[in-house]
């Protein structure tokens, strides 16, 4: 039986998940409709569709595993349920982070303007960067799937053996780190590109101020808005993996639903918050969302009039 605090936090997690799924579904549908209309899909459009679809799967897996862990923890030890969930999770989570990294790099190379020779080389060879990241993703999958299979087999064999669990704490943490090396690489690349873009925008704003453009200059406002979006993304991105770390640590603790659900809240903040940030920060998505809201409002008004 859940306590009042645990019940409230679980409602918060569920709300985050619903908002995240709705936001990502809208992003995917809007870009698919744009492709159907123009018969052409940009790199950003392709990345947004892939990011939205993979993140919908990630959210469903997080919620499914979270509810099972809270209400039916013993089900996870039956058959191959844990194994199937883990494999799907690894595939979708790596793919989601890969798409997010590609999106950050694409925005970085498109917006930033450094005189560094490495940056100029990367900017002229965007396709090479994507191919390299694709190779990193495949390598990460090939390395982590066998390791996860070994970890799951060991946990099945010794499940319930308290002494074995105590002995395997350090081994488990090392294995978790090794299996997530690919994720760590993409996280570092995303945060570095995000930081460099923030630095570029900050320098550009200072340069515009020194030239006497003023705070109300449209370009300055756009740059400030972009900086806020980037900082929000970085915070949510970090919180997502902090939440995942909390869930992993719960493996070593007696059943603590409050801590576990807190980890779920932090984990679900990123897919929910980032989808909203993408919609508000993208002109086409923002216009499409406003049209959708206007359409829903009109439908609701007509429905109320017909009832009366």
From Swiss-Prot:
Disulfide bonds: none
Intervals, Cytoplasmic compartment: 29-43, 116-127, 202-232, 280-308
Topology, Extracellular side: 1-7, 65-94, 149-180, 254-258
Keywords (A to Z) from UniProt: G-protein coupled receptor, Glycoprotein, Membrane, Receptor, Sensory transduction, Taste, Transducer, Transmembrane, Transmembrane helix
Superkingdom classification of source: Eukaryota
Record Gene3D superfamilies: Rhodopsin 7-helix transmembrane proteins
Subcellular location: Membrane
Topology versus the membrane: Multi-pass membrane protein
Glycosylation positions in this chain: 80, 153, 161, 175
Key word Cell cycle present: no
GO cellular component terms listed in the entry, alphabetical order: membrane
GO terms assigned for molecular function: bitter taste receptor activity; G protein-coupled receptor activity; taste receptor activity
Note: Several bitter taste receptors with distinct ligand specificities are expressed in a single taste receptor cell.
Sequence similarity: Belongs to the G-protein coupled receptor T2R family.
Protein name: Taste receptor type 2 member 107
């Amino acid at each position: 039986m859940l306590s009042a605090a645990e019940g409230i936090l679980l409602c918060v997690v569920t709300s985050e998940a619903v908002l995240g799924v709705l936001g990502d579904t809208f992003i995917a549908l809007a870009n698919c409709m744009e492709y159907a209309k123009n018969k052409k899909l940009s790199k950003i459009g392709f990345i947004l569709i892939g990011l939205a679809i993979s993140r919908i799967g990630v959210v469903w897996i997080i919620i499914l595993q979270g509810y099972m862990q809270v209400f039916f923890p013993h089900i996870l030890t039956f058959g191959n349920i844990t194994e199937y969930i883990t494999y799907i999770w690894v595939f979708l989570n790596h793919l989601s982070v890969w798409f997010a990294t590609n999106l950050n790099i694409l925005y970085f190379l498109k917006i930033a303007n450094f005189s560094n020779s490495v940056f100029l080389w990367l900017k002229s060879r965007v396709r090479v960067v994507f191919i390299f990241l694709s190779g990193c993703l495949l390598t990460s999958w090939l390395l982590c799937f066998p390791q996860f299979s070994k970890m799951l087999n060991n946990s099945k064999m010794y499940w319930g053996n308290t002494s074995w669990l105590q002995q395997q704490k350090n081994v488990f943490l090392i294995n978790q780190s090794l299996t997530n090396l690919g994720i760590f690489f993409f996280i570092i690349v995303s945060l570095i590109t995000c930081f460099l873009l923030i630095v570029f925008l900050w320098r550009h704003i200072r340069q515009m101020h020194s030239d006497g453009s003023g705070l109300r200059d449209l370009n300055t406002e756009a740059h400030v808005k972009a900086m806020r979006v980037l900082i929000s993304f970085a915070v949510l991105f970090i919180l997502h993996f902090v939440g995942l770390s909390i869930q992993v640590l719960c493996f070593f603790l007696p059943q603590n639903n409050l801590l576990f659900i807190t980890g779920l809240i932090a984990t679900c903040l990123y897919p929910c918050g980032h989808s909203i940030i993408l919609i508000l920060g993208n002109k086409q998505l923002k216009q499409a969302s406003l049209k959708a809201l206007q359409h829903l409002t009109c439908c609701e008004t007509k429905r109320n009039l017909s009832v009366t």
